[in-house]
Amino acid sequence: MDSAREVSDGRLTVEGFSVASRAFADKWKIHNQSFPPWSWVPLINRTLLVSKKEEGYLSLEKIIILSSLEEEIPEDESLNVATDCLEKEETVDHTILVPTMENEAHYYDFHIVYSASYKVPVLYFRGYCSGGEPLALDVIKKDVPSCSVSLLLESKWTFITQEEHPYLNRPWFKLHPCGTEDWIKLLSQSSSSSGCQMPIVLYLVSWFSVVGQVVGLRIPLEMLN
């Protein structure tokens, strides 16, 4: 398991990411029950060079946004206010979700993936219509709260790019991780100055409390305890 140093320098190892991911998913399931749980997707048989350490990523999928509700949603609400989550997607008949022109449903998938080059988590996401057509970034920005768009425009630590998903080989959007190590390091040092180190189990929770806001996903404060 990672040492306190690996948290204080803002980076994670593969094992640390696995530990932090499971802790994040457990806390989310307990404190954010208006959403379906994040699931751990294991990576198997990738290449002969893969180490014996467990690898995988977190997945939260089929979050539904009804775009006609956008004007009615207060800015301090996250995506779950306009969302009916598919908690048991295998039992849901998607044909009943086909919207009218006035009530268009948009679906969102979110993946938290480990970046081996930056040694930090990266948020990948995509939006699509009920028919499967992908949403352009301009449309996605209209779906998320305006405060999320403002946060992205003012951000000095990230920006949105579109590139191939590292495991699905399809184009997804992602929040670039170029500044993640630095601000996580500052956050860790702040915790350290108060007499405590940021434990590995809170790494992803702390990270997502910032990153999630960019895409309109906020976490309950209880998850930070």
Swiss-Prot record:
The chain crosses the membrane at residues 200-217. Keywords: Autophagy, Membrane, Plant defense, Transferase, Transmembrane, Transmembrane helix, Ubl conjugation pathway. It is found in: Membrane. It comes from the Eukaryota. Pfam families: Autophagy_act_C. Its EC number is 2.3.2.-. One of its GO terms (biological process) is positive regulation of autophagosome assembly. The active site is at 178 (glycyl thioester intermediate). GO terms for molecular function: ubiquitin activating enzyme activity; ubiquitin-like protein transferase activity. Disruption phenotype: Mutant atg10-1 cannot form the ATG12-ATG5 conjugate and fails to accumulate autophagic bodies inside the vacuole. Plants are hypersensitive to nitrogen and carbon starvation and initiate senescence and programmed cell death (PCD) more quickly. Reduced anthocyanin levels under anthocyanin-inductive conditions. Development of spreading necrosis upon infection with the necrotrophic fungal pathogen, A.brassicicola, which is accompanied by the production of reactive oxygen intermediates and by enhanced hyphal growth. By contrast, in response to the virulent biotrophic phytopathogen, P.syringae pv. Induction: Slightly induced upon B.cinerea infection. GO terms for cellular component: membrane. The keyword Membrane applies. E2-like enzyme involved in autophagy. Acts as an E2-like enzyme that catalyzes the conjugation of ATG12 to ATG5. The ATG12-ATG5 conjugates is required for the formation of autophagic vesicles and for the timely progression of senescence and programmed cell death (PCD). Likely serves as an ATG5-recognition molecule. Confers some resistance to nitrogen and carbon starvation. Is also involved in the formation of anthocyanic vacuolar inclusions (AVI). Belongs to the ATG10 family. This is Ubiquitin-like-conjugating enzyme ATG10. It comes from Arabidopsis thaliana (Mouse-ear cress). The gene is ATG10.
